Amino acid sequence: MTAFDSFLQKQRVRMAARFLAPGARVLDLGCGDGALFRQLTWISGIGIDPTLAHSFDLPNASVMAGRFPDDVPAERGFDAVTLLAVLEHLPVEVQRRLDEACARVLKPEGRVILTVPSAKTDLVLAVLKKFRLVHGMALEEHYGYDVRKTPELFGSFRMVAHERFQLGFNNLFVCEKP
């Protein structure tokens, strides 16, 4: 990860943090090295990522190799599920299962907090990757994701917020379970 990748990641975490209460139990999907839990030491939970070689523990979280929802423990009662720069990397058939899978693990009024890039982002990332300013992690996996479809993917949830950030190249969505 380049310094610029790290900067962008920290911005995504800061955007999500505004919607997480102190002490929140969070399930972080596509957690990578556990950056959300490393940055936000006042939350706890579980991180899961299919790219991890092995599972490990942080002071405030267990981070495990695996895929959601199949490999997540049968725990329920999370205050939030986060997908920061993850949704656009998921195949369409997995995206379609997220609403039900997230609802199953969340408390009533629990939140799905996610960031997804705008359509124009892929072109900019491709240029930045060419100049080695970003790694463009799995850029080829964006599946042509259309950010406008995000609300319908979480149709059983109430949309709480939609904000653009990073000069309009990124979007934050917050959906609440009824």
Model-derived segments and their meaning:
Residues 54, 90, 120-122:
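Feature marks short, surface-exposed loop/turn motifs that line or immediately flank catalytic pockets
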Residues 25, 109-111:
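Short glycine-centered segments of the SAM/dcSAM-binding site in methyltransferase folds
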Residues 1-76, 80-82, 96-99, 136-149, ...:
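Conserved N-terminal segment of class I S-adenosyl-L-methionine
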Residues 85-89:
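Short catalytic micro-motifs in class I SAM-dependent methyltransferases
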Residues 96-108:
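A short glycine-rich, Lys/Arg-flanked "PGG" loop and its adjoining helix->strand segment in the class I
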Residues 21, 90-91, 106-108:
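Helix-to-beta-strand junctions that scaffold the AdoMet/dcAdoMet cofactor pocket
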Residues 113-134:
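Conserved class I S-adenosyl-L-methionine
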